[in-house]
Amino acid sequence: MSYSIGIDYGTASGRVFLINTTNGQVVSKFVKPYTHGVIESELNGLKIPHTYALQNSNDYLEIMEEGISYIVRESKIDPVNIVGIGIDFTSSTIIFTDENLNPVHNLKQFKNNPHAYVKLWKHHGAYKEAEKLYQTAIENNNKWLGHYGYNVSSEWMIPKIMEVMNRAPEIMEKTAYIMEAGDWIVNKLTNKNVRSNCGLGFKAFWEEETGFHYDLFDKIDPKLSKVIQDKVSAPVVNIGEVVGKLDDKMAQKLGLSKETMVSPFIIDAHASLLGIGSEKDKEMTMVMGTSTCHLMLNEKQHQVPGISGSVKGAIIPELFAYEAGQSAVGDLFEYVAKQAPKSYVDEAANRNMTVFELMNEKIKHQMPGESGLIALDWHNGNRSVLSDSNLTGCIFGLTLQTKHEDIYRAYLEATAFGTKMIMQQYQDWHMEVEKVFACGGIPKKNAVMMDIYANVLNKKLIVMDSEYAPAIGAAILGAVSGGAHNSINDAVDAMKEPILYEINPEAEKVQRYETLFKAYKALHDIHGYKKANIMKDIQSLRVEG
């Protein structure tokens, strides 16, 4: 019997899973928050801009080393039987290293320089660079722009590199390699310097046929092309292929066999499709956590405005993978819960329940529209379909009678409406949606929210029995790399997670939500582009520390 390891690096924590490659059974798991968390307001006591979201890469090694040691010890599995390791990671999460793959933030002189640290996916400090990249692409009619939804996000790799070039050239001077954090973990495991086609294709303006778009980079700054060529470009390994064996020293350190194979890293949300078994077209999968990614597969490459990218073979070989998303979902609900009145917090504590459970109890019998509220869920910008990280959230319909649970429900509904905008965009561009899957901790824990989604989308909603689909998906790739299965599809069939429950839409609720959605779309269009300057002008008054 063989086993594989899936290491899942999320926004706030990391997970290491040991999986039976025959039946997908979770043999052992390790979950730990990052020691330094997300660095957002201060770095070593120094204030940093509110658009920044950084991390300390030492936390990633801590997860890997402690996690693998734990699952091997706890499971009592002979390491010889662990055939492969797969990695998934939030993206685009960028790391800057020296020639030995050591992160430059560990250098003493850069300890307090935020640009030396890992730039987490939700770091929006490169918004000016993203705008410049977009405008240059538009002016020069770059054909690839349609593959990225006709937009450029500050969350992607190239704008973040430009940000460091512009604002911290001393960091760039000391940097030998720039890569996705997922690639960094793979390279640390194998002592190689490779890149995954998934990370490059979705986040770095790279295509298998043409490579990087140096013609565009040259028009922005010839130095940018040189940085990409010297520090980013490396041999590319496709999803489903093998990077190589564990480095001997790393195998000894982790207590694993040096024959253990390592797969290329896959973006965390994309790994979820493998983990739940969504491997066909006409299926939209919502990977719900801090944010939500909306993923689809298709045999053709369509140029869908407002999506985050389309890459061939980034999840399943020969199929184009499509990604869209919402930047604040779990984060938004957590924000609302933290604003709950003390009486709600006390009631929840007295009844031995969470604030979320209390608010769900209060709203579960409300009909759509009963509160009179509607909201825009842009507290961390809008990724799809407006592709504008500078947009901000709004709520409409407040009265002196509005209760906190009404606000909570309005935000649940807002995220569902945002998902419907994305689903309709896919459908408008020749990608039919017949099934909708939901996976992650939120769907499993929040049936009230899933009921709202089913009725807003007017689709049967299939909720998967897994909080950890990305880790399962990563382990599936590890199993393939280790030879336990001949193909990704075979591994998915054997190891995928089961269905927890299904929800069918209800006609009356669907009709009421259609009315609310029209109002949402009107507000979306007004504040998203027709008069987006209203909230942006207010935001411009904020003073950076």
From Swiss-Prot:
Keywords: Arabinose catabolism, ATP-binding, Carbohydrate metabolism, Kinase, Nucleotide-binding, Transferase. Pathway: Carbohydrate degradation; L-arabinose degradation via L-ribulose; D-xylulose 5-phosphate from L-arabinose (bacterial route): step 2/3. Its EC number is 2.7.1.16. One of its GO terms (cellular component) is cytoplasm. GO terms for biological process: L-arabinose catabolic process to xylulose 5-phosphate. The keyword Kinase applies. It is an enzyme of class 2 (transferase). It catalyses: D-ribulose + ATP = D-ribulose 5-phosphate + ADP + H(+); L-ribulose + ATP = L-ribulose 5-phosphate + ADP + H(+). It comes from the Bacteria. It holds the Pfam family FGGY_N. One of its GO terms (molecular function) is ribulokinase activity. Belongs to the ribulokinase family. This is Ribulokinase. It comes from Staphylococcus aureus (strain Mu3 / ATCC 700698). The lineage of its organism: Bacteria, Bacillati, Bacillota, Bacilli, Bacillales.
